[in-house]
Design a protein with these regions (language model features):
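N-terminally biased helix-coil "hinge/interface" segments that flank
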Residues: 1-400
Length: 400
């Protein structure tokens, strides 16, 4: 494979999806090239390394020299998103104010469609027996109404330890005005050393709205171990291979941040991959003279839609990912767990379904010739003639 890029320093962007990993390199003259390889769901960092090896082969450069000449290295990842969509996160324990343990499951008590009484909500991330109440109360003005009982926290720790909890979320009433109780609970959790991963709502999302704050903190705890393990390992691999600049992560709001911040707040990465599309849409809009566009990005696991109106893409602090309600600054993207690699089937009632499980980096027993009996959306499009067999992505992948 040849490439048109020639002269360092390099600017590198890499996006890891559930199915493919895409690497974009820009050289000092602004020339760009794209490299696509299959992702490695068991270790997404291997997909990044594989894409880098492909690029280095095209450039005829040793890896260490290439990475050493990188001006910056920006990474967008759907690891957090796919962890949530596919239900493959950590076992989470939740500590909440006594009397409010069911807020996470009760949600707002409202349905988006008042006439739809049958569509279930997504599974609650923390089962009731792992939602443990803590005596103590902070009032809306920040004053202490009832003293905190740390013995409740220690009792909950025993339950969490016995059940193998991997990550703990703490969300107490009105902690966004006074975090003293949450700070004390977090200190006990660190002393008890049940697990490494602790998410405290007053650190993650110190805003009004008990349900949304609790939901956001629970999601953060749910995806944290997998995301942190991935990012830490990837950064160390890149450093060992010669990267001298910082690894930056693209956030849901379209900005970039270092790993130090995001390892503890991975909820800000839920739209890390698709938020990069905002820049592409704005660039395209300027080129064709259009200020109103709709962008739809269908990956292997999810589908992301965003709207540009009058040349601007909205930023929101209210986000819903697969019906999990979150409060985190993000590009106004709407995401559902349905992509090209989504597995379809027939349920016990004889009804057709698609998702939420995806085929990962081996999509399609028919489309990609990997064998198996579980068809995906891409298989259906190929069999129905909506997609043509043959090479795609510059010949890096081929549909049978």
């Amino acid at each position: 494979m040849t490439t048109t890029i020639q002269s360092p320093p390099w600017r590198v962007g890499v996006d890891v999806g559930g199915t493919f990993t895409d690497l974009v390199i820009a050289d000092s003259e602004g020339r760009t090239d794209v490299f696509k390889v299959p992702s490695v769901p068991a270790d997404p960092g291997e997909g990044v390394i594989s894409a880098l090896k492909t690029a280095c082969a095209a450039l005829d450069q040793p890896m260490a020299r290439f990475l050493g000449d990188c001006q910056f290295f920006l990474h967008g990842s759907t690891v957090a998103t796919n962890t949530l969509l596919e239900g493959k996160g950590a076992k989470v324990g939740l500590l909440t104010t006594k009397g409010f343990r069911d807020s996470l499951e009760a949600r707002r008590g409202l349905r988006k469609d008042p006439w739809d009484h049958r569509t279930p909500y997504p599974p609650v991330l923390v089962p009731r027996y792992l939602r443990q109440p803590v005596t103590g109360r902070i009032a809306a003005d920040g004053s202490e109404v009832e003293a905190l009982n740390l013995d409740d926290v220690r009792a909950a720790c025993k339950i969490f330890a016995d059940d193998g909890v991997e990550s703990i979320a703490v969300s107490l009433l009105n902690s966004f005005v006074n975090s003293a109780h949450e700070d004390a609970v977090a200190e006990v959790l660190r002393e008890e050393n049940i697990c490494e991963w602790i998410s405290v709502s007053s650190d993650i999302v110190p805003v009004m709205g008990e349900y949304e704050r609790t939901s956001t903190t629970a999601v953060n705890a749910y995806v944290m171990p997998r995301v942190a393990s991935y990012l830490t390992a990837l950064q160390q691999k890149l450093i060992d291979m010669g990267l001298k600049t910082k690894l930056l992560m693209l956030q849901s709001n379209g900005g970039a941040a270092s790993l130090d911040q995001l390892i503890r707040q991975p909820v800000n990465l839920l739209l890390s991959g698709p938020s990069a599309g905002v820049g592409a849409m704005q660039h395209l809009a300027a080129g064709i003279g259009e200020n109103n566009l709709v962008s739809m990005e269908i990956g292997g696991t999810s589908c992301d839609v965003m709207l540009m109106h009058d040349g601007r893409v909205a930023i929101t602090d209210s986000l819903s990912v697969n019906d999990y309600d979150l409060v985190t600054p993000s590009v106004d993207i709407h995401t559902v767990g349905a992509g090209g690699g989504t597995i379809a089937g027939i349920d016990a009632a004889g009804l057709m379904y698609a998702g939420p499980e995806g085929a990962g980096a081996r999509p399609g027993p028919a489309a990609y010739g990997h064998g198996g009996t579980r068809p995906t959306v891409t298989d259906a499009h190929l069999v129905l003639g909506r997609m043509r067999p043959g090479p795609y992505a510059g010949g890096s992948v081929s549909l049978d």
